[in-house]
């Protein structure tokens, strides 16, 4: 603890735990312990994201995956396991706030290899990139407007609270 009362976490520990500068942490106390836990806005809305995944699958017949900055939080594809860690390609899309649309049949890895056409949109709320909306289809239809709408719904829900 520094002279201003702030908790200082050494760079090596931040690097090992994947804590970025300015990232939100939850602080818990337990008798003689202080517990720091990474805070993920998107995870608060797992129920909403799970319902969105099922709804979109039923209406559009596409698979929907919603992630936070580290892992899958909801998926309409039963083969994609929740809490699967994201690989570096997805992390780059989140950090760079980039949208990705595959124009040809391709494969991505979300714990297992998934083949299809992909639309990947970052979830941005309060100027922070919080995760991804991933639409997986078996046709080359343009789902970018649907992906943007879903990312906006999730971001707006986060901004409200």
Regions found by a protein language model. Name each.
Residues 46, 50-55, 86, 90-91, ...:
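Juxtadomain coupling helices with adjacent low-complexity linkers
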Residues 104, 123, 138:
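Fold-independent oxyanion-binding glycine-rich loops
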């Amino acid at each position: 603890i520094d002279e201003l009362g702030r908790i200082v976490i050494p760079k090596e520990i931040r690097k090992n735990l994947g804590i970025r500068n300015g990232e939100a942490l939850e602080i818990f106390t337990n008798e003689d312990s202080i517990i720091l836990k990474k805070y993920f806005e998107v995870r608060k809305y797992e129920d909403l994201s799970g319902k969105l995944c099922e709804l979109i699958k039923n209406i559009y017949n596409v698979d929907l995956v919603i992630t936070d900055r580290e892992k899958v939080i909801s998926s309409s594809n039963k083969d994609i396991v929740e809490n699967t860690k994201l690989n570096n390609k997805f992390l780059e899309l989140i950090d760079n706030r980039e949208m990705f649309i595959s124009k040809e049949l391709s494969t991505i890895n979300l714990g297992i290899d998934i083949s299809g056409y992909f639309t990947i949109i970052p979830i941005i709320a309060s100027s922070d990139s919080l995760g991804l909306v991933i639409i997986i289809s078996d046709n080359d239809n343009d789902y970018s407007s649907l992906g943007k709408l879903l990312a906006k719904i999730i971001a707006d829900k986060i901004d409200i609270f």
